Amino acid sequence: MAGNHAEIFPPSSAQRRILCPGSAVLERGRERAPTSYASSGSATHKVAEWCLTEGTEAAAYIGRVISVDGFDNEVTAERAKRAQDYVDVVRDLHKAVGGELLVEQKLPIAWLTKEAGAEGTGDAVIVGDKELIVIDLKDGNKPVEAEFNPQLAIYLASALEIHGLVNDFETVRAVIVQPRHQSVREWVLPPDELRAWIADNIVPAVEKVQDALVAVQQAEAV
């Protein structure tokens, strides 16, 4: 089955689902209206993707206009620098760890969220011999922690489901790069600890969301 953007338990809304399982019911069938803020973030991600896939530097794209969801985003020197800051972190980690670098990797999450075909996207995934790393670019102003971050935990666990079949990783690492804060935050732990955290925090939340949806469906059927 082809992958789909997750709706019932999207990784980006995982914290909201944990705190309020009923939010899945309220958001059911709704499409989020595009915003200039989200469009701008997507444009910065696109510059970073070009750099990592083409082996270029972000400054090469200054002046280009990237259209996302009806909004035009110019690649200014400031945007290019933010993208480059992230790209430099990814390249440095890849050089240090070795292995394979995967850019914008689709990560099936249906095994965890129980939504057929659901998937997320890892901005950058490094598959080393002994370490698996998922790196996430956050282009916003709000500080985001990497430790115990549900979104990154889902991405990392899903990457582990794929690559852990043929690799015996000693550690897994979630990395958040926030250029606006000039910060790089990490969460490093053994694979079994990540699996335990998922089992204790994400699995129960998914079950509560499923229960809420079933309750509404039963009520609507009366």
Regions found by a protein language model. Name each.
Residues 1-132, 173, 185:
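Metal-dependent nuclease catalytic cores that hydrolyze phosphodiester bonds in DNA/RNA
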Residues 97-216, 220:
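Mg2+/Mn2+-dependent nuclease catalytic core
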